Amino acid sequence: XIIGAPCRRCYHSDGKGGCVRDWSCGQQ
């Protein structure tokens, strides 16, 4: 789940209160 506010599309929580880009996003 997601804990707290979700990150932008294509990003996910880095577990330290920030967001990091989702490496798998848009890779088709």
UniProtKB/Swiss-Prot annotation:
Disulfide bonds join C7-C19, C10-C25. The modification 4-hydroxyproline is found at P6. GO terms for cellular component: extracellular region; nematocyst. Occurs in 2 forms which differ in the post-translational modification of Pro-6. In form SHTX-1 (Shd1a) Pro-6 is a hydroxyproline while in form SHTX-2 (Shd1b) Pro-6 is unmodified. Its main location: secreted. Keywords: Disulfide bond, Hydroxylation, Ion channel impairing toxin, Nematocyst, Potassium channel impairing toxin, Secreted, Toxin, Voltage-gated potassium channel impairing toxin. It comes from the Eukaryota. Kappa-stichotoxin-Shd1a: inhibits voltage-gated potassium channels (Kv). Kappa-stichotoxin-Shd1b: inhibits voltage-gated potassium channels (Kv). This toxin inhibits the binding of 125I-alpha-dendrotoxin to synaptosomal membranes (IC(50)=270 nM). Belongs to the sea anemone BBH family. This is Kappa-stichotoxin-Shd1a/kappa-stichotoxin-Shd1b.
